[in-house]
Amino acid sequence: MDAIKKKMLAMKMEKENAIDRAEQMEQKLRDVEETKNKLEEEFNNLQNKFSNLQNDFDTANEGLTEAQTKLEASEKHVAELESDTAGLNRRIQLLEEDLERSEERLQSATEKLEEASKAADESERGRKVLESRSLADDERLDGLEAQLKEAKYIAEDAERKYDEAARKLAITEVDLERAEARLEAAEAKVWELDEELHIVGNNIKTLSIQNDQASQREDSYQETIRDLTQRLKDAENRATEAERTVSKLQKEVDRLEDELLAEKERYKSISDELDSTFAELAGY
């Protein structure tokens, strides 16, 4: 009888210990579940941050692409201007040569033609920064060439008339006055070209400033992309580490659940054994 009582007490203590261990396991399981939930929440936050970083990266990349497109367009525009300017410089050079030859035929108009040539020289230096007004300038240059041809015709006519009698001197003087008027008009057109060249120069300076600003923005975009790339790598590393931690905790949870199940089964076995013992005692 004493042995049975001792066995019952031992089984009761073992049952209580099993209950305590089961409660401890349940508490540990709850703690692990809470830690797991926190890590999952942090993992979700990291995923959101990763998504935001990806969006920032895409935005910066789009800005960089747009800046590169604008820069390429500016470079193409400058190249076209340089090409147009080279053609205009050649035409101006030819115009100067024609003006020099006309000086020999029309001595009285030499000074004004030289002034027009000097003005053309000045415009030649300024045309290196000429913008998209080449068509309008071509029309004005054509006008100058037409006036030059007309001046040549007047000069040749004057030479023939100088060989004639004095009675044609008055007619020659009238023709010369007309030539002077045309030369004055040519000077006015050259002055007009100088003004336009000045405006074009200012426009080219503005384009140069815009190109510099575009280059600065490109450097800024590149720096932003490098920063975002680094932040993206850091976020990926943290996400990977969080995944590994969650995996470990999940394994720990599974192990604790298995232990808890084993303890419950052991507790059930002890309870069954106690019930059987009580039944035997009742039989006595």
From Swiss-Prot:
InterPro entries: Tropomyosin (IPR000533)
Keywords: Coiled coil, Repeat
Keyword Nucleotidyltransferase: no
Residue segments, region Disordered: 103-131
Coiled-coil stretches: 1-284
Pfam families, sorted: Tropomyosin (PF00261)
The family this protein is said to belong to: Belongs to the tropomyosin family.
PANTHER family named among the record's database cross-references: TROPOMYOSIN
Subunit structure: Homodimer.
Summary of the function given for this chain in its UniProt record: Tropomyosin, in association with the troponin complex, plays a central role in the calcium dependent regulation of muscle contraction.
Domain comment in the entry: The molecule is in a coiled coil structure that is formed by 2 polypeptide chains. The sequence exhibits a prominent seven-residues periodicity.
Designated name of the protein: Tropomyosin-1
Organism name: Biomphalaria glabrata
